[in-house]
Regions:
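A C-terminal-region feature
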Residues: 1-41, 63-210
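Alpha-helical scaffold elements that line and support the substrate/ligand-binding pocket
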Residues: 42-47
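Conserved hydrophobic ligand-interaction patch in extracellular adhesion modules
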Residues: 53-56
Length: 210
């Protein structure tokens, strides 16, 4: 099976689960990124950093261009449930946000120090200053300013990451991806730590998948 086909199948398994179990999260998925936008992203990376768009990220963006949080009336006051944050690593970044982080201050050199990676996932929507990257060696974590070497991948690929997410959702154990476990609230898939939850008012409505 080709890497692209593996990614497509892994993504479909996760999104099919969302469609059946977390329809508000499923509604958060944005359409695929247009070809000209992908070409522009690849060209920017090559111009400023000397490497092109990672093949898996190109393939993912051809399936989904990121997410847009949906309006949830019960969530209006506190706004603590982001319908698009359905992965344990947060939201899928679109090209503009991903390259905005990777090309930060590129006119003065690469603040990341040169790794051929691009961020694609973050829980830090206000920044982002942390998240997951993807490169030829796989998927790992990054954070500013001290963890930008990007040389210790946790998964061999985005597809492997998505496979692990799907296994956690369908088979468990619930903490297979870390202390945050999958749960459902107001039609959304949200990962939280039952021992130290970030959810506040929404917590009483959040129910673990397992």
């Amino acid at each position: 099976m080709s890497d692209q086909r593996h990614l497509e199948l892994a993504w479909r398994r996760v999104t099919d689960w969302l469609k059946a179990n977390a329809p508000v999260s499923y509604a958060s998925l944005l359409p695929p990124v247009p070809e000209h936008t992908l070409e522009a992203a690849d060209a920017q990376l090559r111009q400023y950093l000397g490497f092109g768009l990672p093949a898996e990220l190109d393939a993912l963006w051809r399936l989904c261009g990121g997410v847009e949080h949906q309006y949830i009336e019960a969530n209006e006051e506190e706004g603590e449930v982001g319908s698009g944050a359905f992965l344990p690593g947060g939201i899928v970044l679109g090209p503009a946000d991903a390259l905005g982080v990777r090309l930060l201050e590129c006119g003065r050199g690469d603040v990341w120090g040169g790794p051929a990676v691009v961020p694609w996932l973050t829980c830090d929507e206000a920044g982002p200053e942390s998240g997951h990257y993807v490169g030829a060696d796989g998927v790992g974590r990054w954070s500013m300013p001290d963890n930008l070497a990007c040389d210790k991948p946790n998964f061999p690929s985005i597809a492997a990451y998505l496979d692990a997410v799907h296994r956690t959702l369908t088979q468990g154990p619930p903490d297979a991806m870390g202390p945050d476990v999958p749960g459902l609230v107001w039609g959304c898939l949200i990962w939280d730590d039952p021992e130290a939850p970030l959810l506040d008012d929404a917590l009483e409505h959040w129910h673990p998948v397992h």
